[in-house]
């Protein structure tokens, strides 16, 4: 009987090891959708992605008027890992937002109208106080928690919150305090998505990027989905780096992401889809380390 138990234990151990080993051979892919809650058109696009059922991470902007809709949407999908898209700038000419903590609490972060500056350059040209940056980022986290969101990670809108080593240290401090992961802190390999690809070539671009992935590290695809609606097409980026016809680019990226061809490719046995909740459960918060670059 003793030997039977030993053999059974060995067999189960072998099966478990084989399963883990087989999983280790797969290329891990993590898709992160940014700017959720920015506007209604982005939220509707996010819903299309969520309806595919794939594990996905979605980074929420708590400052925007459509944040409340995003909260109600995200609560309905167990396949999503929710992050806070820490925001310190407001880049649209016709559509501006300001701090969660109130403009009087963080006067060095806002312009004369109480809105965030449009870019990192203009923000840091105003010599923002580190204490105010911490106050504001904390307020954004607290707002998300009060809304009832289960937050798994932090990231940063247009890199403003990690512009300097000092501001990055604030993000790290808050992540440790709230026991949250930070996007790009697990040695993720950044794979440029299709955002800047020509509108007509989004799908082909993304298919090629996935097909040519090589083993080594979790592959991070950051995407910006939306619908080409009057709401989105009216937005004009105050930063020159943004693509023209932004709403068409976002809609094309959405179409590529939810297309049957791309979804079928993602389900190829050689790949393993995961989100930040899954990644953190596998590696633990203690495995995070500051990346060499933003």
Give the residues covered by each predicted segment.
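Acidic (Asp/Glu)-rich catalytic clusters
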Residues: 46-52, 69-81, 98-111, 145-146, ...
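Conserved, mostly hydrophobic/aromatic
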Residues: 35, 82, 154, 221, ...
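Active-site beta->alpha N-cap acidic-glycine motif
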Residues: 23-93
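Catalytic domains of cell-wall/extracellular-matrix polysaccharide-remodeling enzymes
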Residues: 127-207, 211-214
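Active-site gating loops and adjacent loop-to-helix segments of metal-dependent hydrolytic enzymes
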Residues: 96-123, 237-245
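Bacterial Sec-dependent N-terminal signal peptides
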Residues: 1-24
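C-terminal domain-boundary segment and adjacent tail
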Residues: 182-185, 240-294
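Active-site beta-loop-alpha junctions enriched in small/polar residues
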Residues: 36, 63, 85-91, 159, ...
């Amino acid at each position: 009987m003793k030997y039977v138990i030993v053999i059974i234990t060995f067999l189960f151990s072998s099966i478990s090891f084989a399963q883990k080993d087989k999983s280790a051979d797969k290329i891990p892919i993590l898709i992160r959708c940014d700017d959720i809650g920015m506007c209604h058109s982005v939220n509707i696009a996010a819903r299309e992605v969520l309806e595919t059922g794939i594990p996905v991470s979605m980074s929420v902007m708590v400052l925007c008027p459509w944040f409340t809709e995003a909260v109600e949407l995200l609560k309905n999908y167990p396949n999503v890992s929710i992050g806070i898209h820490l925001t310190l700038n407001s880049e649209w000419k016709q559509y501006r937002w300001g701090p969660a903590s109130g403009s009087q609490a963080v006067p060095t972060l806002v312009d004369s109208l109480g809105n965030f500056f449009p870019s990192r350059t203009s923000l840091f040209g105003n010599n923002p106080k580190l204490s105010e940056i911490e106050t504001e980022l904390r307020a954004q986290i607290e707002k998300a928690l009060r809304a009832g969101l289960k937050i798994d990670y932090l990231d940063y809108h247009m890199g403003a919150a990690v512009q300097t080593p000092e501001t990055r240290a604030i993000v790290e401090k808050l992540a440790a305090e709230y026991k949250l992961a930070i996007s790009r802190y697990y040695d993720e390999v950044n794979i440029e998505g299709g955002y800047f690809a020509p509108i007509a070539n989004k799908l082909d671009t993304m298919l090629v990027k996935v097909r040519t992935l090589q083993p080594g590290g979790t592959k991070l695809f950051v995407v910006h989905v939306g619908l080409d609606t009057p709401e989105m097409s009216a937005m004009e980026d105050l930063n020159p780096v943004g693509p023209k016809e932004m709403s068409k680019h976002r809609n094309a990226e959405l179409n590529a992401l939810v297309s049957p061809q791309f979804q079928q490719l993602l389900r190829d046995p050689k790949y393993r889809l995961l989100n930040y909740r899954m990644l953190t459960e596998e590696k633990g918060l203690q495995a995070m380390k500051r990346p060499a670059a933003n």
